[in-house]
Amino acid sequence: MNDISLKQLEIFVAVVEYGGFTRAAEELFFNQSTVSAHISLLEQALGKELFVRSNRRHVRLTKEGEQVYPIARRILNDCAALRTLFSDADSAPAVALGASTVPGQYLVPGYLAAFLKREPEFRYSLRRGDSEQVHRMLKSGQIAVGFVGAVSEPENVDYFPLYDDRLVLAALNNEHYRMLRERGVYGRELLLEEPFVSREEGSGTDTSLQNYLRTLGLSHDMLHVVARVDDPEAIKQMVSGGVGVAVLSALAVEQEVQNGTLLAFEIDKSALKRTIYLITLKSQQLSRMEQKLVDFLKSPHRRKRAEAQN
């Protein structure tokens, strides 16, 4: 049997977790031929085909591939744990973090600033994406700790509720919308009537909205969507410019509501809430600094102090 390398296992796991050769190559910054070559070498070493190759964008595991995947993932996790086992504060690498848009912009910076005051040697990198992308970063080992607004993989991921957020319908502060506010209109009454600026698919905000619409017997396709935008700041500019209304986190529009630029309608009589979660991989052993950060964030009074300083 030929030797098996960690690089081969890393690429194999990436193809599985990203769902195809093309996406794995993009995420690992390799070309597709490099990814294919490493997979071929791994298959030669094992003497088995690991993927059913219908096309390069979407692949599925063979029976043998399904047996190899959990072992390969465990080996990569153990190697990551070994790298941090004897690291001290001075030589410890930066903690790799990932956050979806809303927590990454409006919540996590305050948490990290508070933790940095407590642990001056703390160093971190913060990657941004939607909730689905952050889950993929976690599973592929690109980050150790994540912050998301949606639950998608409870069998593999530990979710700790950090913050109870609520979604509101944001509208331009003009006479038309002020009259509707005075009449006690809820945001759900405007969803089907007004031009709508939507968050991108895969975001926690979009997932929460689609779940809510289903409870009403509605779908996202029934909204008059004029644009899909992946940045709440850009969406607020569009709403301020009169393009349409939008469903956003109350955190995202707090300042604009206070200064009178935007109005925030409650979506329904019962506020539409969603939870911001701290996530870690169940199978991964955290480094000492990563564990310190997680323990800090799980302390309610420490979080409250950090939120008050945001």
Question: Model-predicted segments: where are they?
Answer:
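Hydrophobic hinge/microswitch elements
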Residues: D130-V134, K139-I143, V148-G149, N211-R214, ...
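A late-sequence structural motif
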Residues: L107, L263-E307
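Alpha-helical linker/hinge and terminal dimerization helices associated
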Residues: A45-L46, V68-A89, K304
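A short LG(V/I)-centered, amphipathic sequence patch enriched
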Residues: E43-L61
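Short helix-boundary/capping micro-motifs
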Residues: V13-N31
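Secondary-structure junction motif
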Residues: R178, G187, E194-G217, L286-E290, ...
